[in-house]
């Protein structure tokens, strides 16, 4: 296990979470405005990366994500000759699918609807930060070919999923990232697996067993 020390920003934000919890327990906050479930959820996001909570915060060295990237790269280099593969599990900050324009336009008072009607271009929005994109960009920047990195979320049909799993088994795709729900049970890509990275901890203990079961299974050549 690799231990990442909290940044100063994370330490300050944890104090804020504690203050929120005190208010909730004292009954001075409307449960619809704040509650322990929200606080716990925010704590999980903060524990993964401070930029999930506020993407304007700096990308600091030594964080959980950056240590994971370094670890992935080292294993990737060491396993080059045998095309060894890795899985990265992360249930938080997953890739977000883009809604079709036609569907979004049907929503009342949707700004896209008004833009389509008046041909006024919408202002560009800064893409939301996701850990998945951040890791992929950093791996590529350090020399890993883009076609060796894949997100399970991109295989949105059974045919595509079957093709993706085949590429992982043969070592064409060497780093596969996904959530427990999408990459847990039924993901049989163990042939060349050398490492499994848990970036976060799922709610249910059984989900950790599902993750572990992707690599510790019959057919793993390592």
What are these regions (language model features)?
Residues 84-92:
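Conserved RecA-like ASCE P-loop NTPase motor core of nucleic-acid helicases/translocases
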């Amino acid at each position: 296990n690799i231990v990442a020390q909290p940044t100063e920003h994370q330490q300050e934000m944890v104090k804020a979470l504690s203050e929120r919890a005190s208010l909730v327990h004292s009954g001075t906050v409307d449960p619809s405005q704040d509650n322990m479930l929200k606080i716990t959820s925010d704590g999980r996001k903060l524990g993964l990366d401070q930029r999930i909570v506020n993407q304007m915060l700096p990308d600091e060295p030594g964080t959980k994500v950056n240590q994971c990237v370094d670890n992935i790269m080292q294993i990737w280099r060491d396993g080059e000759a045998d095309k060894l593969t890795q899985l990265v599990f992360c249930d938080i900050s997953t890739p977000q699918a883009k809604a079709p324009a036609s569907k979004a336009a049907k929503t009342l008072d949707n700004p896209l609807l008004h833009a389509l009607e008046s041909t006024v271009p919408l202002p560009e929005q800064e893409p939301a930060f996701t850990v998945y994109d951040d890791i992929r960009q950093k791996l590529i920047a350090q020399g890993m070919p883009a076609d060796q990195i894949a997100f399970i979320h991109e295989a949105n049909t059974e045919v595509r999923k079957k093709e993706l799993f085949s590429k992982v088994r043969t070592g064409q795709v060497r780093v596969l990232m996904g959530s427990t729900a999408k990459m847990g049970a039924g993901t049989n890509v163990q042939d060349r697996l050398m490492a499994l990275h848990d970036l976060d901890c799922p709610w249910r203990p059984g989900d950790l067993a599902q993750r572990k079961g992707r690599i510790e299974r019959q057919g793993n050549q390592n």
